[in-house]
Amino acid sequence: MADGQLPFPCSYPSRLRRDPFRDSPLSSRLLDDGFGMDPFPDDLTAPWPEWALPRLSSAWPGTLRSGMVPRGPTATARFGVPAEGRNPPPFPGEPWKVCVNVHSFKPEELMVKTKDGYVEVSGKHEEKQQEGGIVSKNFTKKIQLPAEVDPVTVFASLSPEGLLIIEAPQVPPYSPFGESSFNNELPQDNQEVTCS
């Protein structure tokens, strides 16, 4: 057989330069077809929450961190999602911890207290003259304590970066028959700064 000859005819379709959307008789109908579906089945003149809520609240296969999704007890049990208004339970042995950014407040302008199962953090600036006006800042943040935390053991410390770190050790679960497998000693943090 001579060089460059093949025993059978061979054509390479890749050598043909062809635009399938231009040359095909289906090209004009392919991109225009809606496949029998409306692009937006709902009325677009309605306010967005009414037409977006069904799409956002449909069942998802995993956890979805959105405030619009209703969470029932089955979703809580199935996916380990805490009920609304509750903090996720801490791991056994680890303290419950929350950080609040208070970088624009001085320690003496902050107050942390526990009341009715909540930690309440509040801060207030006195009025300051800034850029042609008087500025006064104040805030109050309430954080619900988990059931595993005793409100009496809550303490707060302020980091140099302006983060208020609120911590509390977990209450050990009840142990029947006086068998104690838990360490009753709590670690002491000597570097904490109390905010009043």
Swiss-Prot record:
One GO cellular component term noted in the UniProt record for this chain: cytosol
Subunit: Monomer. Forms a ternary complex with BAG3 and HSPA1A. Component of the chaperone-assisted selective autophagy (CASA) complex consisting of BAG3, HSPA8/HSC70, HSPB8 and STUB1/CHIP. Interacts with HSPB1. Interacts with DNAJB6. Interacts with BAG3.
A single MF term (Gene Ontology): identical protein binding
Function in brief: Involved in the chaperone-assisted selective autophagy (CASA), a crucial process for protein quality control, particularly in mechanical strained cells and tissues such as muscle. Displays temperature-dependent chaperone activity.
Biased amino acid composition, Polar residues: 178-196
Keyword terms, alphabetized: Chaperone, Cytoplasm, Methylation, Nucleus, Phosphoprotein, Stress response
Residues found modified as Phosphothreonine: T63
Changes after translation: Phosphorylated.
Region listing for Disordered, in residue ranges: 1-28, 176-196
Matches recorded under InterPro entries: A-crystallin/Hsp20_dom, Alpha-crystallin/sHSP_animal, HSP20-like_chaperone, HSPB8, HspB8_ACD
Matching CDD domains: ACD_HspB8_like
Asymmetric dimethylarginine found at: R71, R78
Residue list for modification Phosphoserine: S24, S57
Protein name as catalogued: Heat shock protein beta-8
Residues that span the membrane, as ranges: none
Induction annotation: By heat shock.
Keyword rRNA-binding in record: no
Pfam families in the cross-refs: HSP20
GO BP: any one term: cellular response to unfolded protein
Localization, UniProt: Cytoplasm; Nucleus
Family listed: Belongs to the small heat shock protein (HSP20) family.
Principal location listed in the UniProt entry: cytoplasm
Protein source organism: Rattus norvegicus (Rat)
Domain sHSP span(s) in chain numbering: 74-185
